[in-house]
């Protein structure tokens, strides 16, 4: 019945990833101690039964995780509530089994189990909002229609759900079809037939719904944009599932609207995804019926010398509207033919440079900039590196000021098309001016805003970019801006390893040890985030950071961050050893037991408990270094928060049992001579005296406060 705790479980999940990752984390912790539970051999019938139940609960949880990594996204979206209930039942079963078994295992193992039980109780399993919305849309769709073919409205609803579930690429659709086929074969029922027909309609894209119109020469309504009532040249799908002409829906958003023009549903995601299949159908129909559809953006480009090219050059180079070059003149030709003077810079700084829907008056050729400029601009830095240096500075400042309070707009921008020119700009600024001046500050502020609004862009940052941040940390001028960026990066799964490999860790430690108070706390927050990585913890220990953390605790500064970092360092064997060997470290940690901040108390107890669980020698050191630890723990057990009470009681029990074992060993060693003697080479342990505990009515299980045996706290009567 022994479980192979090295068994691999899925690392990624198609759906309900937040719930699955929480369950996987808990299962991993249980499987690591399961061999120890088996070795404890709970011999009673109830113990064996509980062990079997725990085995079954683990198997069911792992089956759920495997299911969420392999099954159909659509099916899991529809049955999301059932899957959540299944996960909650699995968590409850694990909690119940561990709670029953911890009373029949040794104390050290009981403490480990208690920590897992506490974590199980505090863990809340939830579904992602987008998945709930997609499931709701599909369920409503399945209830609306019972016919074999889907109507256009149903297709729109399905597009909305498919976008939410990221079923927008051919590869994703093929994988989904295979998963659906497996489910249909397993169920052997007709209840899923309608769901399968909806999936097929994704590929047909409602072609059947309007087949008659296409064959009789009548222009299908689906080819027309709802906003312009004209045939679409570049159809795009928005997050509501409806399709529009790219230029028209972009204009709709530019005017400040944040809802779908058809469904009136408020949108959080303003991404525009090309409807390739519909465009292909439109092209085929137009070719068959002799209709020529013109690009609606052509009327916005006039190949005339009267145009103010300082305003139009950015939109000319942008790929957002696919503006054709009728004059055959390249961007380089424009740069060489038309100089950008100071008046052009002033127009850029006023926001006229990157307005995406630039309207040009046909009579005067002057640019008419909409006052309510877009929040969803695409590639605003396109062509940045082709401009003169002074113009680049103006452009970066213009974009920074425009999006300063609207980082949501960055979600729809391409990371590569935004980051590449901006990183190149920062490198050039570093080569031209070093780390001095406001030029780099503006670039770093813009980079921070972009990474904060578009977190997926962090994955595309190369290691050389992180090395550049390390250089900026060494500068007093831009260190604060670099720290702001590193704090964001340290919170991302792909950030910590690259930060460490770039050498920024030592720079952060230098800032912490410096006298720059305005930077110290921010550096501590970043280090706290980085300490969640075990590899970085080992490097922090090697750099002797624990001594600095100890001094912070003694000085009562940055205690909140310091104790969390120490807690993370304590998760490694090297960190535990260094904490016990660093002078005054244990005493400083124990002093936080008297803190008025529950979080600091809880983290301090967690560190001491981790140490006591690992080695008896650590328990002895805790008792020796931490004065009045017993009275502090008793006080917390009575007056602390519920979570702190549990941890304090467990730590108290561990310390008391170690003291009891020591007394028994001393008694046995003293019996042959009739009195206690100590050899010259033996270690002399100074007895720690504590006040007599309050006597209470003994429980059937154990005597003493909270069921603990406090004989070790009393003086032995000879």
UniProtKB/Swiss-Prot annotation:
Q: What class of enzyme is it?
A: transferase
- Domain U-box spans what residues? 218-292
Keywords linked to the UniProt accession: Repeat, Transferase, Ubl conjugation pathway
Pathway listed: Protein modification; protein ubiquitination
Q: Any keyword Repeat?
A: yes
For biological process, the GO terms are: protein ubiquitination
Task: Give the reactions, separated by semicolons, that this protein catalyses.
Answer: S-ubiquitinyl-[E2 ubiquitin-conjugating enzyme]-L-cysteine + [acceptor protein]-L-lysine = [E2 ubiquitin-conjugating enzyme]-L-cysteine + N(6)-ubiquitinyl-[acceptor protein]-L-lysine
Q: Where is this region: Disordered?
A: 662-704
Q: Which domain of life is it from?
A: Eukaryota
Signal recorded as keyword: no
One function term, GO molecular function aspect: ubiquitin-protein transferase activity
What EC number(s) does this enzyme carry?
2.3.2.27
Biased-composition ranges, Polar residues, are 676-686
Q: Where are the ARM repeats?
A: 493-532, 534-571, 573-613
Xref: InterPro entries? ARM-like (IPR011989), ARM-type_fold (IPR016024), RING-Ubox_PUB (IPR045210), Ubox_domain (IPR003613), Znf_RING/FYVE/PHD (IPR013083)
State what this protein does: Functions as an E3 ubiquitin ligase.
Q: Which PANTHER family match?
A: U BOX DOMAIN-CONTAINING, U-BOX DOMAIN-CONTAINING PROTEIN 5
Q: What is this protein called?
A: U-box domain-containing protein 5
């Amino acid at each position: 019945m022994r479980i192979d705790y090295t068994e691999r479980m899925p690392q990624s999940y198609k759906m309900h990833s937040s719930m699955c990752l929480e369950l996987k984390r808990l299962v991993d912790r249980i499987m690591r101690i399961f061999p120890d539970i088996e070795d404890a051999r709970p011999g009673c019938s109830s113990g064996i039964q509980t062990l079997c139940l725990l085995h079954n609960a683990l198997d069911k949880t792992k089956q759920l995780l495997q299911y969420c990594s392999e099954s159909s996204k659509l099916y899991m979206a529809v049955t999301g509530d059932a899957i959540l209930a299944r996960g909650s039942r699995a968590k409850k079963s694990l909690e119940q089994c561990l709670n029953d078994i911890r009373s029949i295992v040794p104390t050290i193992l009981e403490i480990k189990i208690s920590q897992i039980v506490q974590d199980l109780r505090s863990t809340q399993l939830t579904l992602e909002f987008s998945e709930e919305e997609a499931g709701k849309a599909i369920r409503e769709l399945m209830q609306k229609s019972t016919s074999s073919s889907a109507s256009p409205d149903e297709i729109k609803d399905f597009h909305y759900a498919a976008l939410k579930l990221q079923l927008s690429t051919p590869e994703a659709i093929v994988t989904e079809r295979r998963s659906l086929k497996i489910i249909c074969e397993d169920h052997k029922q007709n209840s899923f037939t309608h769901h399968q027909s909806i999936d097929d309609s994704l590929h047909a894209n409602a072609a059947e719904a309007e087949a008659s119109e296409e064959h009789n020469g009548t222009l299908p309504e689906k080819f027309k944009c709802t906003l312009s009532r004209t045939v679409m040249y570049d159809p795009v799908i928005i997050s509501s599932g409806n399709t529009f002409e790219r230029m028209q829906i972009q204009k709709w958003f530019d005017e400040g609207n944040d809802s779908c023009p058809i469904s009136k549903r408020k949108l959080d995601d303003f991404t525009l995804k090309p409807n390739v299949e519909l465009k292909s159908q439109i092209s085929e129909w137009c070719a068959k019926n002799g209709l020529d559809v013109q690009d609606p953006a052509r009327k916005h480009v006039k190949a005339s010398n009267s145009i103010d090219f300082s305003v139009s050059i950015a939109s000319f180079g942008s790929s957002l509207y696919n503006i054709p070059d009728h004059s055959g003149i390249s961007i380089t030709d424009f740069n060489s033919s038309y100089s950008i003077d100071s008046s052009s810079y002033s127009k850029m700084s006023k926001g006229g440079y990157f307005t995406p829907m630039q309207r040009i008056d046909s009579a005067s050729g002057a640019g008419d900039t909409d006052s309510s400029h877009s929040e969803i601009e695409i590639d605003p830095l396109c062509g940045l590196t082709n401009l003169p240096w002074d113009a680049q500075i103006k452009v970066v400042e213009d974009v920074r000021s425009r999006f300063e309070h609207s980082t949501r707009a960055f979600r729809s921008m391409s990371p590569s098309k935004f980051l590449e020119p901006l990183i190149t700009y920062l490198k050039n600024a570093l080569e031209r001016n070093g780390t001095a001046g406001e030029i780099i500050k503006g670039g770093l502020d813009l980079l921070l805003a972009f990474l904060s609004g578009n977190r997926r862009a962090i994955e595309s940052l190369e290691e050389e970019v992180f090395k550049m941040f390390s250089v900026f940390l060494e500068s007093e001028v831009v260190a604060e801006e670099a720290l702001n960026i590193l704090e964001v990066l340290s919170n991302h799964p792909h950030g910590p390893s690259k930060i460490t490999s770039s050498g920024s860790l030592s720079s952060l430690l230098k800032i912490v040890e410096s006298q720059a108070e305005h930077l110290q706390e921010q550096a501590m927050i970043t280090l706290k985030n980085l300490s969640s990585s075990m590899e970085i913890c080992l490097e922090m220990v090697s750099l002797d950071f624990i001594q600095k953390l100890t001094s912070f605790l003694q000085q009562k500064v940055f205690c909140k961050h310091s104790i969390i970092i120490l807690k993370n360092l304590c998760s490694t064997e090297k960190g535990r050893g260094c904490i016990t060997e660093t002078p005054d470290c244990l005493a400083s940690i124990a002093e936080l037991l008297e803190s008025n901040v529950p979080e600091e108390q809880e983290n301090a107890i967690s560190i001491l408990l981790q140490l006591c669980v690992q080695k008896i020698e650590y328990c002895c050191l805790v008792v020796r270094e931490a004065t009045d630890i017993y009275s502090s723990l008793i006080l917390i057990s009575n007056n602390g928060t519920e979570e702190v009470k549990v941890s304090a009681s467990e730590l108290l029990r561990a310390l008391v049992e170690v003291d009891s074992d020591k007394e028994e060993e001393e008694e046995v060693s003293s019996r042959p001579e009739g009195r206690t003697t100590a050899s010259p080479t033996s270690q002399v342990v100074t007895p720690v005296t504590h006040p007599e505990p309050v006597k209470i009515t003994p429980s059937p299980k154990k005597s003493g406060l909270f069921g603990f045996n406090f004989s070790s706290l009393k003086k032995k009567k000879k």
